[in-house]
Amino acid sequence: MTYKTSDLSIAAYLMMKGMKLLDATRAHNGQFMFEFDDPNGKGVQLAIEFTGSECAVYDNHVRNLKKILYRN
């Protein structure tokens, strides 16, 4: 069983939680796809857990800082 996500932040969180990255690709349209080994079916649960974590708060601050830097 595998878990796939196109969200870079969730992918990093899953790696931090010990999930093994099997593949990382970039489509012609620029979209990323990360595939993880998920033998216990915990990918969805961990992705939901990410939304309420300190990691999500950090990620949001990084995004806001990028908006400030790249505003033109």
Residue ranges, per PLM feature:
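C-terminal basic regulatory modules in eukaryotic proteins
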Residues: P39, G43-N72
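Acidic, low-complexity, intrinsically disordered interaction modules
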Residues: R26-E35, P39-V44
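N-terminal acidic leader/helix
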Residues: M1-H28
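Acidic-enriched, low-complexity/disordered segments with a strong bias for Aspartate over Glutamate
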Residues: D7, D23, D37-D38, D59
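Aromatic side chains
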Residues: Y3, Y13, F32-F36, F50, ...
